[in-house]
Amino acid sequence: GRKVIVAGNGGSAAMASHVAVDFTKAAGIRAINFNEADLITCFANDYGFEHWVEKALEAYADEGDVVILISSSGKSKNMINAAHQAKKMGLSTMTFSGFESNNPLRQSGNFNFWVDSKEYNIIEMTHHIWLVAVVDYIIGKIEYSA
């Protein structure tokens, strides 16, 4: 265990790829994302699009992992279902969402970050800044802890 799993849809999936690489390369923390076309199409075909991320978590997550789920609206059913699966598995979950303050994803994680906006670009860029800031914080802790 002890890796970070990052998932999102569309622009949030691109962000998941970027931040997973940053966690691994810059912060020295093993991180993966679920953006492989064969994984998405196989699991979505076999389990339904709303369930493919939770099924990927079942297959790839280990005890002690941290799951980061990103959805601008906070209403993406595959992200919500993944949050519930992560909870069942005892994994720590961080969610990143926007739009309505009471969106379902925001209610589903251990740590929930919400952007008070209804503009996709503002929400996505804020999520990106926050996620990169987490990596920078970890790097700072590593570099300055000695």
Regions found by a protein language model. Give the residues of each.
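Glycine-rich phosphate/diphosphate-binding loops that line cofactor/substrate pockets in enzymes
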Residues: G1-R2
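Glycine-rich phosphate-binding loops that contact phosphosugars or nucleotide phosphates
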Residues: I5-Y144
